[in-house]
């Protein structure tokens, strides 16, 4: 039985960091003579290869490197990978803004796909919502820079962040971690593995994060909640034969994030708010709050033969996202021009609070079939077929009511052939055809 329990407490992080820095440096010097070069194996081309043999700009991060580098979230990957900048969007809960080689997209709008793709367990996220996630339960992380349309079902111009989570082990095991800090911060997460007869296993996972804002609200004389996040998941693996297996996973999540706004009162009509006197304080009574609630389902079926592998991946994402802000009804808002070209405006009721909501419902369903060779000879290839259906519905109000529906139906065929000319040179040729 594999049992691991970890407790962490984050108090006075600056002092602790200064105290431990000399110890860390000393440990590195002591290990310098005994540490050698370790071969890094990546799966950028759907097969296990040495990173030196892959003609792709890829950075691979192991779970050990994540732990040693204190990389706990997908937002932290930019600390270890060059040419990568990651941060959470200004609005939206658990929505990521990813930039690779200067190509980025920083919005929660679903009608525009992000320039940097994120794939979790082989499923491409058609939106950047949900791109902020914990790295507690990962087997490997690879960051590929540049277009990857010949290797992945969904193409992106900036690159791909490819994350593979651990599969059920089929044995009893547990991994727990608890973190506490100031501003009432708490983070509890864990994984429980159990056998499923002698043919597979079950994995249960959970995570709960709560914390108050670092900004003190002078109107409420208190700190309001900043983040309240809860995620629960289950994964079932079944081995039909020695060479054929299936993994079915389901995740349910509920996130809430509150932004401590400091809004200039002259920002726009209908937006009454006070400007903060100090960046650590805010007088705003009703700040912007974002909610993200949904569920993900993934099915992966793999068949391994002597010199090839066939894999089928299905992914379903269904979630709702709400951005809400309360405003003070003063002034007016513009309606545009009338038929004579005269500006038209509508007055608001002075002294009335009203909420401005931006609701989005999003659902995507994807199917991908991959065929990957593993020949002993100089030639190998990867080929696949990819299908994606995604639709989003957005509504907003009450000041300016509007609705919009966006739909994507995409089918693609992709592939890449590599040939080793000799021990030094190799040739790789890829192609892709997409109908959308």
Protein language model annotation of sequence segments:
Residues 77, 108-109, 116, 121-147:
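Short acidic/polar hinge/loop motifs at secondary-structure boundaries
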Residues 131, 209, 214-222, 259-265, ...:
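Outer-membrane beta-barrel translocator domains and adjoining extracellular loop/strand segments
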Residues 58, 66, 78, 141-146, ...:
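Non-catalytic regulatory/gating segments with a bias toward low-complexity or hydrophobic composition
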Residues 245, 249-294, 356-360, 386, ...:
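Flexible loop and strand-edge segments within Gram-negative outer membrane beta-barrel domains
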Residues 173-175, 180-211, 215-260, 295, ...:
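Transmembrane beta-barrel wall of Gram-negative outer-membrane proteins
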Residues 1-69, 75-81, 193, 242, ...:
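N-terminal Sec signal peptide and the immediately downstream disordered periplasmic leader
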Residues 74-77, 97-101, 119, 140-143, ...:
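N-terminal periplasmic accessory domains that precede
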Residues 43, 79-123:
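Extracytoplasmic beta-strand/coil segments of soluble accessory domains associated
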């Amino acid at each position: 039985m594999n049992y691991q329990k970890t407790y962490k407490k984050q108090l006075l992080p600056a002092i602790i960091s200064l105290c431990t820095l000399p110890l860390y440096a000393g440990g590195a010097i002591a290990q310098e003579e005994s540490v050698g070069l370790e071969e890094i194996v990546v799966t950028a081309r759907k097969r296990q290869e040495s990173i030196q043999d892959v003609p792709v700009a890829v950075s691979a991060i192991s779970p050990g490197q994540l732990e040693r580098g204190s990389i706990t979230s997908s937002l932290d990957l930019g600390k270890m990978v060059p040419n990568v900048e990651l941060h959470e969007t200004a609005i939206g809960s658990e929505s990521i803004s990813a930039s690779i080689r200067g190509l980025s997209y920083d919005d929660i709008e679903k009608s525009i796909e992000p320039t940097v793709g994120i794939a979790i367990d082989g499923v491409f996220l058609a939106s950047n919502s949900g791109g902020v996630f914990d790295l507690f339960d990962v087997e490997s992380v690879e960051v590929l820079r540049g277009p990857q349309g010949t290797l992945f079902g969904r193409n992106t111009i900036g690159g791909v962040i490819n994350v593979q989570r651990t599969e059920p082990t089929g044995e009893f095991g547990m991994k727990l971690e608890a973190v506490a800090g100031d501003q009432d911060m708490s983070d509890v997460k864990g994984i429980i593995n159990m056998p499923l007869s002698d043919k597979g296993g079950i994995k249960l996972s959970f995570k709960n994060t709560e914390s108050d804002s670092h900004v003190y609200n002078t109107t409420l004389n208190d700190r309001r909640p900043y983040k309240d996040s809860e995620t629960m998941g289950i994964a079932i693996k079944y081995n039909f034969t020695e060479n054929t297996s299936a993994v079915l996973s389901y995740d349910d999540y509920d996130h809430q994030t509150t932004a401590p706004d400091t809004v200039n009162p002259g920002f726009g009509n209908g937006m009454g708010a006070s400007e903060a006197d100090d960046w650590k304080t805010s007088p705003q009574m009703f700040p912007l709050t974002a909610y993200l609630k949904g569920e993900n389902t993934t099915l992966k079926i793999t068949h391994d033969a002597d010199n090839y592998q066939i894999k089928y991946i299905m992914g379903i994402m269904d979630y709702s996202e709400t951005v809400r802000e309360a405003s003070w009804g003063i002034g007016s808002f513009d309606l545009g021009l009338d038929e004579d070209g005269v500006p038209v405006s509508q007055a608001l009721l002075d002294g009335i609070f009203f909420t401005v909501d931006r609701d989005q419902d999003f659902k995507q369903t994807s199917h991908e079939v991959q065929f990957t060779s593993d020949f002993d000879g100089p030639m190998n290839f990867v080929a696949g077929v990819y299908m994606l259906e995604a639709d989003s519905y957005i509504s907003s109000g009450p000041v300016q009511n509007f609705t919009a529906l966006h739909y994507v139906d995409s089918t693609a065929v992709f592939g890449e052939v590599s040939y080793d000319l000799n021990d030094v040179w190799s040739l790789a040729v890829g192609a892709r055809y997409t109908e959308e």
